Structures are given as C-alpha cells and as structure tokens.
Amino acid sequence: KVFERCELARTLKELGLDGYKGVSLANWLCLTKWESSYNTKATNYNPGSESTDYGIFQINSKWWCDDGKTPNAVDGCHVACSELMENNIDKAVTCAKQIVREQGITAWVAWKSHCRGHDVSSYVEGCTL
C-alpha cells in the first residue's frame, strides 16, 4: 500500500508516534517519505551485510526482523520482516518505536540526510489531524 501523505500522518498519530520519544509527527513523515515514499511494500537489499530493509520504515533484517535468510540476524523486534510490509502498519510502528527507544531517530540514515536540521513542517501542512 502506498499511503497518501495526510492519511499516513493521521495513521501514525492514531498509533501514538506524534511526539514519541520527542520525535514530532512531521519528522516521522519526513523519514518515511525518504525511506520508502510511504510504500509499505518497499524493500532494499544491502549487499555488504547481506541484509534487507523492509516496509514503510525500511526496517533492517540484520537487527530488527526475521526474513529467514539474513546471516547472523538478531530479530530485535521479534517480528517476521514480511509482517512489516502489511497494509496494516501496526507491527511496523511497534518495531519503529522499539528502534527509536534503543537507538534514537538517528538510526535512520534518511532522517539524518534529509530531515535533521530542516524545516519539516510541510510534511503535515494541510492535514486534518
């Protein structure tokens, strides 16, 4: 599923991400825009670690989810990577919360590259929240 921007903003707010660990809703929108273009089915393979990033938050199979093929995987969120690509993003959000609790928002490279230090208010502009 490819979310429309304001639809995703509303969904993330309902699931408790607005202000979670001090991260604003606009920052989560910026992160997901640059990680996956709001697409729950996004995947990206990382040849170096032989791991794959999954779903709207691009959660990595080396550390956070189990895809059954990543060497020495940790599965920190105790979730199948396939579950992070469901149209229902509850499990993906639960895992993203764990990542931000343990490592902070800087765990996401796209956030550091595209969102940190930028005015991200436009990501929620015009949305009825």
Swiss-Prot record:
It comes from the Eukaryota. Monomer. Lysozyme C is capable of both hydrolysis and transglycosylation; it also shows a slight esterase activity. It acts rapidly on both peptide-substituted and unsubstituted peptidoglycan, and slowly on chitin oligosaccharides. Pfam families: Lys. Belongs to the glycosyl hydrolase 22 family. Coiled coil: none annotated. Lysozymes have primarily a bacteriolytic function; those in tissues and body fluids are associated with the monocyte-macrophage system and enhance the activity of immunoagents. The active site is at E35, D53. GO terms for biological process: defense response to Gram-negative bacterium; defense response to Gram-positive bacterium; digestion; killing of cells of another organism. This is Lysozyme C-1/C-2. One of its GO terms (molecular function) is lysozyme activity. SMART domains: LYZ1. Keywords: Antimicrobial, Bacteriolytic enzyme, Digestion, Disulfide bond, Glycosidase, Hydrolase. Disulfide bonds join C6-C127, C30-C115, C65-C81, C77-C95. Residues 1-129 form the C-type lysozyme domain. InterPro entries: Glyco_hydro_22, Glyco_hydro_22_CS, Glyco_hydro_22_lys, Lysozyme-like_dom_sf. Its EC number is 3.2.1.17. It catalyses: Hydrolysis of (1->4)-beta-linkages between N-acetylmuramic acid and N-acetyl-D-glucosamine residues in a peptidoglycan and between N-acetyl-D-glucosamine residues in chitodextrins. The keyword Hydrolase applies.
